[in-house]
Amino acid sequence: NRWYCNSAAGGVGGAAVCGLAGYVGEAKENIAGEVRKGWGMAGGFTHNKACKSFPGSGWASG
């Protein structure tokens, strides 16, 4: 499965509130996975935190 940051603002299209518009990743919501995707430790933490900071947002498979 592919994983993407899903937000209440509009699914993949609303991923801008998660830190990157249209972001598609191969990892669930874990910092190690984001580090593997090249975000770096700080980037992974920030991305995950932003993704979960909006009501109804989070990671979803697609």
From Swiss-Prot:
Which Gene Ontology terms of cellular component type are present?
extracellular region
Record note on pH:
Stable between pH 5.0 and pH 8.7. Activity is lost at pH 3.0 and above pH 9.5.
Q: Which key words tag this protein in UniProt? A: Antibiotic, Antimicrobial, Bacteriocin, Secreted
Q: How does activity depend on temperature?
A: Thermostable, retains activity after heating at 100 degrees Celsius for 5 minutes.
Q: GO biological process annotations for this chain's record? A: defense response to bacterium; killing of cells of another organism
Q: Where in the cell is it found?
A: Secreted
> What role does it play?
Bacteriocin active against the Gram-negative bacteria S.enteritidis, S.choleraesuis, S.typhimurium, S.gallinarum, E.coli O157:H7, Y.enterocolitica, C.freundii, K.pneumoniae, S.dysentriae, P.aeruginosa, P.mirabilis, M.morganii, C.jejuni and 20 other Campylobacter isolates, and the Gram-positive bacteria S.aureus, S.epidermidis and L.monocytogenes.
Q: Which family does it belong to?
A: Belongs to the bacteriocin class IIB family.
Q: What's the protein name?
A: Enterocin E-760
- Source organism per UniProt: Enterococcus sp
